[in-house]
Amino acid sequence: MNYNFGGNVFDQEVGVGGEGGGGGEGSGCPWARPCDGCRAAPSVVYCRADAAYLCASCDARVHAANRVASRHERVRVCEACERAPAALACRADAAALCVACDVQVHSANPLPAITIPATSVLAEAVVATATVLGDKDEEVDSWLLLSKDSDNNNNNNNNNDNDNNDNNNSNSSNNGMYFGEVDEYFDLVGYNSYYDNRIENNQDRQYGMHEQQEQQQQQQEMQKEFAEKEGSECVVPSQITMLSEQQHSGYGVVGADQAASMTAGVSAYTDSISNSISFSSMEAGIVPDSTVIDMPNSRILTPAGAINLFSGPSLQMSLHFSSMDREARVLRYREKKKARKFEKTIRYETRKAYAEARPRIKGRFAKRSDVQIEVDQMFSTAALSDGSYGTVPWF
């Protein structure tokens, strides 16, 4: 461990070595606290765990003995009086001071004192050096991207024949270094960003058109499937056709983007309608009278605003189930209910056989001992009943 902290830097402020020091002008602190270990060298650190002032050699010898001793907290000795542990560090003077010396030194100066804990001086120094080196490396790397010193030096070496050539080369090198190179860099950045934006916009448009085409194809396939099922199982009147007609009529009024958003909203809405209808039809004995479409103020929000999809008179009609359809559905439900089979299956045959063989008392299962007790009671009661007639003992 290296504890070379240098000499005292507060001789003039505290009065050491001159007027109030009591020692020579060129000498250090003659009253520095000696090391508690060797009693020969001045102490440089203070160990709080051992409550001892140690020099650099004694500190290395004592605290390097084992791991427990190496974990002891140690602080520097005050650089002004060299007789007390340092409590804080002054950034302006780059020195560690105890409380008394801090008050004595900074009370004479009207400037505000900037102090930090003494234990964090070393950590802050390491962090500061790392950040400074990192900033310098990044700055050097950034300027290396724009450097053309090798090209400029080659031009200057090849064109040193006369003064005119030197002037021309110097002008061209200056232009290339300070103007042409920077302008070229910024122009390229602007052009590249503009070109990249144009390419991204074109790709987004092509991707959007492709998505619109896929959505239209999916919607057409869904319409075909619903049209095929409409004659056999669909109970609600055809809503897909009405919605598609209104979509085609709306395409001529609004733009392509609004039309695409409207088709997406309609497809989502039709999916919800089909789900609600299929769920209601599966319920036993419950036939809904109307669907969500009966609400007159149902709207679909699009980026262009709220568009009323059911403002036309054809869609405002109440979608009630006809009586024939209701009767057919009820009859079909009853037929399915009659066709249900409820068969009793014996899960454990051995248990059934054992239950049939077990003894019972008044219909309930009984243990073997209980049966024997009951039989004994029956015989005892029979004997008592026989004794009521009277028996003559024979000797």
Swiss-Prot record:
Could you tell me where this protein is found in the cell? Nucleus
Q: Which domain of life is it from?
A: Eukaryota
Name the positions where Zn(2+) 1 binds: C35, C38, C58, H63
Q: Does the keyword Metal-binding apply?
A: yes
Gene Ontology BP, a term: positive regulation of short-day photoperiodism, flowering
Which residues are in the CCT domain? 326-368
What triggers production of this protein? Expressed with a circadian rhythm showing a peak at night and then decreasing to reach the lowest levels around the middle of the day in LD conditions. The levels of expression in SD conditions are slightly lower.
Post-translational modification (record) = Phosphorylated by OSK4 in the presence of HDR1.
MF terms per GO, please?
DNA binding; DNA-binding transcription factor activity; zinc ion binding
List the SMART domains hit by this protein, alphabetically: BBOX
Instruction: Give the span(s) annotated as Disordered.
Output: 147-176, 208-228
The residues that hold Zn(2+) 2 are C78, C81, C101, H106
User: Low complexity: which segments have biased composition?
Assistant: 152-175
Instruction: Sum up the protein's function in the record's words.
Output: Probable transcription factor involved in the regulation of flower development. Required for the promotion of flowering under short day (SD) conditions and the suppression of flowering under long day (LD) conditions. Positively regulates the floral activator HEADING DATE 3a (HD3A) under SD and negatively under LD conditions.
Anything else known = The GIGANTEA-CONSTANS-FLOWER LOCUS T (GI-CO-FT) pathway to control photoperiodic flowering under LD is conserved between Arabidopsis and rice, but the regulation of the downstream gene by the upstream regulatory gene is reversed in the two species. In Arabidopsis, GI acts as an activator of CO, which in turn activates the floral activator FT under LD conditions. In rice, GI activates HD1/CO in a similar manner to that in Arabidopsis. However, under LD conditions, HD1 suppresses HD3A/FT expression, causing the suppression of flowering.
Q: How does it assemble?
A: Interacts with HAL3 in the dark.
**Family assignment?**
Belongs to the CONSTANS family.
Question: What is this protein called in UniProt?
Answer: Zinc finger protein HD1
